[in-house]
């Protein structure tokens, strides 16, 4: 129980500053992705005088409450699903058909039956509905996985769930021996201690309805306007943060990278975080979650490296 109160962002940024001091660095140079952007922005707010260079890619906007963040992310995943379906439709054998306007309906026809009967797989577990959705979402994190997603949906159309189950296992951190990494559990523990809890069933009901509207490809059509309370509602320790705009007077020039079609941390979150920090915003055009030094884009990588090494700020309005 004591541990649960000390795994959140508040404690981690203190640890980061201790590590900086122990290593003998007068100031911190930091590149953070996804949740790492929350760590970076929180560190900047707490220790602006200790920052040398800060690059935040795939922004978590701390001014958003959990409901707002969830709905923004739902819309992000829907946008990337639409982009995938449009790309897939260029091929006559696309499992979602050649009309992107019908892609959601075709997708629901493929995954809906899994709610009653899992698809067979070489693994004795079979492919459940939840695993299918998880596998699809994993593939939407990067357009490098779209070809594999097409393979998985084509297999499902033929009654086989192997590839989608492999994608779900990738997301969940499942090892070959059947054990799992603790990544998802750790993420739940962190967000539950960081953020305010939603304890009103009416709020979760409205959130569920709005989520279905924002991401129709994830809507099973069974929404009633009611929904169970989420895991964090029963978390046994108080939350340590509330939504707020980041304020970091004295912070040196920093950089935020935001991808136009990022499903998990949508583009606008990066725009908003850059404004709060007074940071230079680099826009990356692509369909993926985070891009700096991982997408293989010379324009973006050069700008980030030049800043981290030489503190050379990117050109205003840089788009890569």
Regions found by a protein language model. Give the residues of each.
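Alpha/beta-hydrolase fold nucleophile elbow
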Residues: 25-35
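Active-site loop->helix "elbow" adjoining a glycine-rich segment at hydrolase catalytic centers
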Residues: 34-39, 47, 261
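Conserved alpha/beta-hydrolase "acid-adjacent" motif
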Residues: 263-268
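Alpha/beta-hydrolase fold active-site neighborhood
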Residues: 104-251, 294-296, 302
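Short beta-strand/loop motif that positions the catalytic acidic residue
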Residues: 250, 255-258
């Amino acid at each position: 129980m004591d541990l649960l109160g000390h795994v959140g962002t508040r404690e981690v940024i203190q640890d980061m500053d201790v590590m900086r001091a122990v290593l003998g660095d007068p100031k911190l140079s930091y590149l953070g992705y996804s949740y790492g952007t929350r760590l970076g922005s929180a560190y900047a707010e707490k220790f602006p005088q200790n920052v040398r260079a800060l690059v935040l890619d795939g922004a978590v906007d701390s001014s958003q409450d959990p409901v707002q963040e969830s709905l923004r992310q739902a819309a992000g995943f829907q946008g990337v699903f639409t982009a995938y379906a449009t790309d897939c439709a260029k091929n006559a054998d696309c499992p979602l058909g050649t009309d992107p306007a019908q892609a959601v309906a075709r997708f629901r026809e493929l995954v809906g039956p899994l709610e009653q009967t899992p698809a067979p797989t070489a693994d004795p577990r079979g492919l459940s509905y939840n695993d299918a959705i998880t596998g699809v979402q994993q593939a939407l994190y990067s357009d490098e996985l779209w070809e594999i997603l097409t393979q998985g949906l084509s297999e499902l159309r033929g009654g086989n769930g192997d590839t989608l189950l492999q994608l779900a296992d990738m997301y969940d951190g499942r090892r070959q021996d059947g054990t799992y990494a603790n990544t998802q559990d750790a993420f739940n523990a962190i967000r539950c201690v960081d953020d305010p809890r939603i304890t009103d069933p009416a709020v979760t009901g409205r959130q569920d309805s709005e989520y279905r509207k924002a991401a129709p490809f994830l809507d099973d059509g069974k929404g009633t306007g009611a929904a169970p309370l989420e895991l964090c509602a029963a978390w046994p320790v108080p939350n340590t943060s509330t939504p707020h705009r980041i304020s970091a007077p004295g912070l040196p020039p920093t950089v935020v990278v935001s991808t136009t079609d990022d499903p998990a941390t949508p583009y606008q979150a990066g725009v908003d975080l850059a404004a709060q920090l007074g940071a230079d915003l680099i826009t990356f055009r692509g369909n993926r979650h985070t891009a700096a030094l991982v997408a293989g884009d010379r324009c973006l990588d050069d700008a980030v490296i030049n800043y981290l090494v030489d503190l050379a700020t990117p050109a205003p309005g840089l788009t890569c």
